[in-house]
């Protein structure tokens, strides 16, 4: 990953993202936790968190079985993976062969392993007036806010492991790694976010901590494969 590059913080206004463990439908996330900052910027970051909470409360529904229009599928582009390309929303990514599509209200696309429900990938889009991801702030700040406010339940402990910035084809992406500790398991996860054409894109993927060493290379492939296609 590229080294962390900081930029001025700014209020975030994005929607709730994620997946909640279910016996049949696998994973979906909701989050809450504290966002720590220096005293000199506490007022601005408090405002940022309030906007997050308000927006999340409006947009975040739970799992449903509503039908969704399918994305177009490309041929397998890497051994052990299948490719998905959404022409309407202009993004593409790879997911491990054998994962199945599930429908979760509020998520644009979700694939999961039917045997290991914590192994999944989801993509979420919400409107934004920002032009680039950098306008929201530096990678670590934005990742911590997303993890604590969006990507884990409020009763679970979250830990940000790493956050970085990289550019691909002139577009800036933030990538981050984190864990979410529940009572009976810990999920080790990866995420990538970017802004394009009035949308804030979030892709998250992960696995049970006990399977992290086995799955981490595949999950990094998933995160690294996410690209805006325009």
UniProtKB/Swiss-Prot annotation:
Location(s) in or outside the cell: Plastid, Chloroplast thylakoid lumen
GO BP annotation list: photosynthesis
UniProt xrefs under Pfam families: PsbP
MF (Gene Ontology): calcium ion binding
UniProt entry tagged with the keyword Chloroplast: yes
GO cellular component: chloroplast; chloroplast thylakoid lumen; chloroplast thylakoid membrane protein complex; cytosol; extrinsic component of membrane; photosystem II oxygen evolving complex; thylakoid; thylakoid lumen
Knockout consequences: No visible phenotype.
Ranges annotated as spanning the membrane: none
UniProt keywords, alphabetically: Chloroplast, Plastid, Thylakoid, Transit peptide
Protein purpose: Required for efficient repair of photodamaged PSII, but not tightly associated with the complex.
Protein family: Belongs to the PsbP family.
Name of this protein: PsbP-like protein 1, chloroplastic
Source species taxonomy: Eukaryota, Viridiplantae, Streptophyta, Embryophyta, Tracheophyta
Gene that encodes it: PPL1
């Amino acid at each position: 990953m590229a080294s962390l590059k900081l930029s001025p913080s700014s209020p975030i206004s994005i929607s709730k993202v994620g997946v909640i463990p279910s016996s049949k439908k696998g994973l979906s996330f909701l989050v809450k936790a504290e966002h720590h900052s220096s005293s000199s910027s506490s007022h601005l970051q408090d405002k940022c968190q309030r906007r997050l909470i308000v927006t999340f409360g409006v947009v975040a529904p739970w799992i449903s079985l509503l039908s969704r229009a399918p994305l177009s599928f490309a041929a397998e582009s890497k051994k052990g993976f299948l490719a998905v390309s959404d022409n309407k929303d202009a993004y593409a990514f790879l997911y491990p062969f054998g994962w199945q599509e599930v429908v979760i209200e509020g998520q644009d696309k979700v694939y999961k392993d039917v045997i290991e429900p914590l192994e999944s990938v989801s993509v979420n889009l919400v409107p934004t007036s920002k032009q680039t991801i950098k306008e929201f702030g530096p990678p670590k700040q934005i990742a911590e806010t997303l993890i604590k406010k969006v990507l884990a339940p409020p009763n679970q402990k979250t830990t940000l492991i790493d956050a970085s910035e990289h550019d691909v084809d002139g577009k800036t992406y933030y990538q981050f790694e984190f864990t979410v500790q529940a009572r009976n398991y810990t999920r080790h996860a990866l995420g990538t976010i970017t802004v394009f054409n009035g949308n804030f894109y979030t892709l998250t993927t992960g696995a049970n901590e006990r399977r992290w060493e086995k799955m981490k290379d595949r999950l990094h492939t998933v995160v690294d494969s996410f690209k805006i296609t325009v």
